[in-house]
């Protein structure tokens, strides 16, 4: 074994191309599974879901490159018609809808979570991992709020910044804070399953 392989026994490792491809597929599937836990809110087109937990954990566990690939696969599957988006949604129209920015932000967030964890939390310290998850979550909001504002503008609706935050940030902030903490707690177990020490 070398420095990039498991420090502990693993379910499978990432030492071959086929296993990395499997890990990418599992990461995409994990996000798709959590996306089915969705709670629509009456005052916003953005639902509450668990998929952000999957995005953060997949990115941090797989690493920046494989994590981003997993989320690209997830988006491709949904755009192709598989019911993997929130609540079983599917179709390319989702990428142009009110939640399209959030979906596109998943790729950036997975990459950022992986990159930051590899750089600052490879020693398994929970606080740096938690901060990395928060930064990755901020990337989702940056893309998501921009996409939501663009969608509303195209629909002929005007919204102020406070109004935009009321639709696309504040209802989800506490839950996403908790999901970031949970992802940081679960990360060592995910690394163990993948046979990772913190870096690929």
Give, region by region, the residue ranges found by the protein language model.
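Membrane-embedded alpha-helical hairpins and interfacial helices in multi-pass inner-membrane proteins
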Residues: 44, 120-200
């Amino acid at each position: 074994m070398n420095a990039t392989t498991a420090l502990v026994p693993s379910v499978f490792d990432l030492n071959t191309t086929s296993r990395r491809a499997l890990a990418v597929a599992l990461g995409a599937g994990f996000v798709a599974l959590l996306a089915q836990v969705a709670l629509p809110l009456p005052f916003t087109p953005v639902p509450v879901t668990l998929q952000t937990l999957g995005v953060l954990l997949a990115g941090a566990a797989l690493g920046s490159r494989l994590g981003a690939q997993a989320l690209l696969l997830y988006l491709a599957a949904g755009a192709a018609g598989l019911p993997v988006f929130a609540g079983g949604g599917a179709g390319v129209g989702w990428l142009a809808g009110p939640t399209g920015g959030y979906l596109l932000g998943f790729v950036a967030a997975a990459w950022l979570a992986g990159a930051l964890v590899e750089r600052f939390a490879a020693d398994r310290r929970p606080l740096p991992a938690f901060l990395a998850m928060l930064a990755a979550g901020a990337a989702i909001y940056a893309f998501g709020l921009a996409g939501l504002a663009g969608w509303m503008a195209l629909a002929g609706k005007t919204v102020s910044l406070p109004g935009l935050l009321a639709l696309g940030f504040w209802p989800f902030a506490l839950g996403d804070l908790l999901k970031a903490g949970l992802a940081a707690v679960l990360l060592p177990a995910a690394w163990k399953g993948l046979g990772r020490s913190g870096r690929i």
